[in-house]
């Protein structure tokens, strides 16, 4: 399991725009680069990132080989009600990581 960091407010007022920042430790190996022994390193990419606010998709991104290792993704959404945000990274070789964070809306 990769280390994921999610930075966002724990509380917000209804209608506030909240900024969300995510970072995941991942090599994002393109499959084009030779290793120390000269053999091509196998491709290992995160292909898709999604964020659901309760069950509503609020952000998604497709990632490509040009994305650097440890991809940082920042986006905003509107706080509408208390709930859970679910962050999902999916990639090559069956890689899937899911993290959740709660948001309390007053």
Task: Give residue ranges: language-model regions.
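Aromatic sugar-binding surface patches on proteins
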Residues: 66-73
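Short acidic/polar inter-strand loop motif in beta-rich domains
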Residues: 90-99
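Short, compositionally biased P/S/T/A/G/V-rich stretches that sit at domain boundaries
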Residues: 1-13, 18
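Extended low-complexity, serine/threonine- and proline-enriched intrinsically disordered segments
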Residues: 37-57
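Short beta-strand edge segments in extracellular beta-sheet folds
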Residues: 102-106
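Short, aromatic- and glycine-rich surface loops/edge beta-strands on solvent-exposed regions
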Residues: 83-91
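Short amphipathic, basic-aromatic surface patches that mediate peripheral association
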Residues: 24-41
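Extracellular Ig-like/FN3 beta-sandwich strand-entry sites
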Residues: 17, 80-84
